[in-house]
Amino acid sequence: MRKFMKGCAITALLFILLGLILGVSGSLGNGSTHFSLGEFLSAVTLGRISEEKVDDWNDGVTEQIRENIGDVHYDLEDNVDYDSDYEVKSGRIELYVLGDDSQGITDLQVQVGGCVMKIQVSEDNCFRVEADGMRKFQGYVEGGTIEIRGTSKASNNSEGNLGGSICLYVPEGYYFENTSLDLGAGSLSVEELQTGTLEANVGAGKMTFEKLDADQAELDCGAGQMTVEELSSRVAEVSVGMGSVRLNGDVTERLDGECSMGELKLTLAGTQTDFNYDLSCGMGELKVGDDSYNGLAQEKQINNNASKNMELECAMGSVVVEFK
């Protein structure tokens, strides 16, 4: 936590310094004269900072950015690990049975990108899967784990939808010991999920849970969106990069939330005094119930002698906690 606040303070100082430099150099230039970064720093430090060294450094960094910006490439298939022991299918995959609830299936692992995936309740006690419009797809059971892997490109499937689609059917009320859901671009919607541990990761896509029951839930959202409409969890850890997470439900022991530049909104069962708090806010907005903590590098610990704990860190984004 202390490292976090130190980082926030340093970041804020850099932004303030950058704003000062741009503002002063703009006024000195009167909108028409160009001042290099080296010229400006040399002037305001009375020559203590060398103009040539600063400009050489600035030119070098700029050139490296120009050389490498074209190499930035995101390939959905780079993030999906296909197993060479199983057939990689493509196109339309007819509905088939993976197993049933008597076969000792304990875990679920999903790695998908560029497609629309749904996890829905099965009509019977069988696990089934079907797919359409997929560039690559695997669905199998190994060592008690259901493995679903797939990627697709932007194209129409047989139903006229953009991109590929996958639908996994799970028996109603089935309990997984461990669940891992990894989504690149695209969307993943879950009708209901009961699990011991959950790791859910969203890159640039959208993940939605209608009903989630997890002893320990770890939710990680990069530049995408994640929504949990109904949560029941003992421990929940939520991390947001530049995306947004909205979570509604009940956490009975501990909730940790981190937000960099995105948005985190939590609507929790109970009252504000049901938790003890460890709060950190850099340049963002942090609001818990009726209290707001905005400003530069604020820290606050609140002991309500409660049985539950909440730790929140907000760098430059927005964290809002409400109670119902």
Regions inferred by a protein language model and the residue ranges of each:
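Glycine- and aspartate-rich repeat motifs characteristic of hemolysin/RTX-like Ca2+-binding segments
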Residues: 178, 185-187, 197-199, 204-206, ...
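N-terminal Sec-pathway targeting helices
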Residues: 1-17
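Generic hydrophobic alpha-helical membrane-segment signal
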Residues: 7, 103, 174, 191-194, ...
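Hydrophobic alpha-helical membrane-insertion segments, chiefly the h-region
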Residues: 16-28
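Short, surface-exposed interaction patches in beta-rich subdomains
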Residues: 97, 140, 145-147, 151-161, ...
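Short linear S-[DN]-x-LW-Φ motif typified by the pepsin-like aspartic protease active-site region
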Residues: 26-152, 157-182, 187-197, 208, ...
